[in-house]
A protein has these predicted regions:
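Conserved alpha-helix/loop element of class I SAM-dependent methyltransferases that forms part
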Residues: 34-53, 68
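A short SAM/SAH-binding and catalytic strip from SAM-dependent methyltransferases
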Residues: 121-136, 158
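A structural alpha-helix within SAM-dependent methyltransferase catalytic domains
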Residues: 44, 67-70, 93, 136-143, ...
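C-terminal helical/coil "lid" or tail adjacent to the Rossmann-like core of SAM-dependent
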Residues: 2-31, 213-239
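Conserved catalytic/acceptor-binding region of the Class I
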Residues: 136, 147-225
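A short acidic, Gly/Pro-enriched loop at the edge of an enzyme's catalytic core
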Residues: 112-123
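Helix-to-beta-strand junctions that scaffold the AdoMet/dcAdoMet cofactor pocket
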Residues: 74, 132-133, 146-148
Length: 239
């Protein structure tokens, strides 16, 4: 399993991820990985991925989906998993090694500019594309990773109204605190930046994709082992 890295000039959003969010995400890995498995399971059942395929996993995070994809494509296939956070990638490498997976490569890079080879059958992202600083640049470069006939699937959050696990805590907080100012640091456009289907359709079309299809997924979400854990998680990562 290769551990080569791609060095990029980090944007302020990448800096925010590495300096602010990585320690929090690491602390609550049991929620951010375990709590999202139902979304992946519903999608993975129908992914057009088989033995021998070459796959990219964009914004791979802790690497759990990359490892699942590596098992799916088997020893004759390969997975290129890319993320901007070294700490996340280290978890992926360690977990892959522990599970005997050697057909996945974890790379540090900016998906918007990474020099993908146009040789992949499939490109996947779970809750990664919504944080692109330039969505069209990121989506276009994901398409550049695909060979003719390749397919891209991404999972993104719908509107906050459809996600009370974040929406309700935000409403409560705003009863007592003002919203963040314009100069507040952030991780980028945010988790709900791709909630508008019409807008995302245009982004995909501009990026060169053909006949985009949207599917609504409703799945349970674990937000903590117990009430105290859920509250601590929201205070750390929520509104």
């Amino acid at each position: 399993m290769s551990t080569d890295q791609q060095t990029d000039n980090a944007s302020e959003f990448v800096d925010f991820w590495n300096e602010i969010l990585v320690p929090k995400f690491t602390k609550y890995k049991h929620i951010l990985v375990g709590g999202l498995t139902h979304h992946s399971e519903k999608v993975f059942a129908s992914l057009p991925v088989g033995e021998g395929d070459k796959v990219t996993d964009v914004g791979c995070g802790f690497g759990d989906t990359a490892i699942l994809l590596a098992r799916r494509v088997g020893p004759t296939g390969s997975v290129l998993a890319i993320d901007c956070c070294d700490a996340f990638l280290d978890y992926g490498r360690k977990d892959a090694e522990a599970e005997g997976i050697d057909n996945v490569t974890f790379v540090n890079g900016d998906v918007q500019t990474y020099p993908f080879a146009p040789e992949h059958d499939f490109c996947f992202s779970r809750f990664g594309t919504q944080f692109f600083e330039n969505p069209v640049a990121g989506l276009r470069n994901m398409r550049a990773s695909l060979k003719p006939g390749g397919v891209m699937t991404m999972i993104v959050w719908r509107a906050m109204d459809d996600n009370p696990w974040l929406g309700l805590p935000r409403e409560v907080v705003l009863q007592y605190l003002p919203p963040p100012g314009d100069d507040a640091r952030s991780c980028g456009p945010g988790p709900f930046s791709m909630a508008d289907q019409d807008m995302v359709t245009k982004q995909l079309e501009i990026s060169g994709y053909v006949d985009p299809v949207f599917e609504r997924i409703d799945a349970p979400l674990m937000v903590g082992r117990d009430l105290d854990d859920a509250i601590a998680f929201q205070l750390a990562i929520g509104p």
